[in-house]
Amino acid sequence: MAGIPEVVAMDCEMVGLGPQRVSGLARCSIVNIHGAVLYDKYIRPEGEITDYRTQVSGVTPQHMVRATPFGEARLEILQLLKGKLVVGHDLKHDFNALKEDMSKYTIYDTSTDRLLWHEAKLQYYSRVSLRLLCKRLLHKNIQVLPGSLLGVGGCILPGTDILHLLLYVGMVRIADLRLLTPFLPPSCLACPLLPESLASARSHAVISALSSSSHLLTPLPNPSQGPQGHVDRLSGQLQDWGGSPLAPALPVSAEQLAGPLLCGRCQGHNGALQNLSATQSPARAALPWDVRLNFILIQG
């Protein structure tokens, strides 16, 4: 699968620094797609620690005795992330703590993926935590004890759960991409306003990389919504789809879709796009649940 970046998941813990208790990096863990730990160190931040946030971070003064200095840890972490696709939840906080420009990296952030929110029936929330997403979608409790980042006390490593979440939504995304891409004009595919679940080559790269690790299919739960067998139907083809040219997964034509399938958010963007109404077409109503879900996201 040439050209597919290596996928890693990163999770950081913070402490409060100075009188304003500004967040500083106190621990960073990185795992690869197979769940192997690539990095896990306590880090001594620059500045005086005024709040260890132990109840949330699990960090204590004892951890700082032999902690790696921030400057040294930062170089180690950034070297590990170089050239990789970084998966995480609310990654802007992690990169801020690393004093690094996040735009230099290829990332996938579960905190901004609205498709995940819809899957978990959390679409009306203004903010969604990783704990809640994992509870709703994976039926797992994470971060239940201080210091549970790497499974202390039987807890699950958040980075691994992020990858499982990514695979869960990725199965829907692959179906969407294969079905919908042939009907989207290049101008729409290139539009930065188009939901990432449809157009992003970055998303497809993540899914393709994940699809090469078949063991990650095992813990995937059946969704409570949608027709029975949805997961089985997709997971059986996931390996074959990885890195393959996109093609319609179902025999659906543009005519059956009652007009061009265009991004409603782009209306007026290039003068050629229209709003999509998923409720006014019998053909659309007959489409699989995973594709109808994406219609909702386009309109949203």
UniProtKB/Swiss-Prot annotation:
The keyword Transferase does not apply. Mn(2+) 1 binds at D11, E13. One of its GO terms (biological process) is rRNA processing. GO terms for molecular function: exonuclease activity; exoribonuclease II activity; metal ion binding; U1 snRNA binding; U2 snRNA binding; U3 snoRNA binding. It is an enzyme of class 3 (hydrolase). Signal peptide: none annotated. Binds 2 manganese ions per subunit. SMART domains: EXOIII (SM00479). Interferon-induced antiviral exoribonuclease that acts mainly on single-stranded RNA. Inhibition of several viruses does not involve the degradation of viral RNAs, but rather the inhibition of translation of viral proteins. Exerts a translational control over a large panel of non-self RNA substrates while sparing endogenous transcripts. This activity correlates with the protein's ability to localize in cytoplasmic processing bodies. May also act as master regulator of over hundred interferon stimulated genes leading to viral genome translation inhibition. Associates with PML and SP100 in the PML NB complex. Associates with survival motor neuron protein (SMN)-containing macromolecular nuclear complexes and U1 and U2 snRNAs and U3 snoRNA. This is Interferon-stimulated gene 20 kDa protein. It comes from Mus musculus. The gene is Isg20.
